[in-house]
Swiss-Prot record:
Entry EC no(s): 7.2.1.1
Catalysed conversion reaction: a ubiquinone + n Na(+)(in) + NADH + H(+) = a ubiquinol + n Na(+)(out) + NAD(+)
Protein name: Na(+)-translocating NADH-quinone reductase subunit D
Origin species: Photorhabdus laumondii subsp. laumondii (strain DSM 15139 / CIP 105565 / TT01) (Photorhabdus luminescens subsp. laumondii)
Transmembrane segments: 42-62, 72-92, 103-123, 131-151, 178-198
Length: 209
């Protein structure tokens, strides 16, 4: 039977205490590429969470039958299969968003968070805990993505979900959109500020020299 304390730890821990982006600095590439809009950040969060959760579940389910010499290949095959399913669903039901995300959905297979949880946790833990660990890490990744996407879209174009929130000067409003926020380097600075803020609140996360 699943340990409720362990499930709570693996589900909530990655949100703040062990965030895969803020603490482990994983999954940075997609965090830069898909956060120009809040909508794409949310969809990418859902996609990564589903792939991480179900890949961890299936890998945990067969962990005792995977030879150590080919475990990485098996893990990648399972992850790749799930990524293809997610990509096909997006193309079928959310084609415009799928086009905006471009190759980055397919590149979920190379996301260190997905592979890392499969190797570090799913290969050593029961299926239910592994599934919840996948959800927790996917949501931890998503929290940063959504925050970055929120700030970049709001200050870069004055919109959220494509809806004008702050009317631009060109349209008779007061806000002058800052195009810098729509460039990839801005995501680096925002993520850096989020990491700084989190480690200020939680000094234990600061690396010791």
């Amino acid at each position: 039977m699943a340990d409720s304390k362990e499930i709570k730890r693996v589900l909530l821990g990655p949100l703040l205490d062990n965030n895969p982006i803020a603490l482990q600095v994983l999954g940075i590439c997609s965090a830069l590429a898909v956060t120009t809009k809040l909508e794409t950040a949310l969809v990418m969060t859902i996609a990564v969470t589903l792939v991480t959760a179900f890949s961890s579940f299936f890998i945990s389910l067969i962990r005792h039958y995977i030879p150590g010499s080919v475990r990485i290949i098996v893990q990648m095959a399972i992850i790749a299969s799930l990524v293809i399913v997610v990509d096909q669903i997006l193309q079928a039901y959310a084609y415009e968003i799928s086009k905006q995300l471009s190759v980055f959905v397919g590149l979920i297979i190379t996301n260190c968070i997905v592979m890392g949880r499969a190797e570090a946790y799913a290969m050593k833990s029961p299926p239910i805990e592994s599934f919840m660990d996948g959800i927790g890490n996917g949501l931890g990744y998503g929290v940063i993505l959504v925050l970055v996407g929120f700030l970049r879209e709001l200050f870069g174009s004055g919109k959220l979900f494509g809806i004008t929130v702050m009317e631009s000067v060109q349209n008779g409003g007061w806000y002058q959109p800052n195009g810098l926020f729509l460039l990839a380097p801005s995501a680096f600075f925002i993520i850096g500020m989020l990491i700084w803020g989190l480690r200020t609140l939680k000094p234990a996360q600061v690396e010791k020299e």
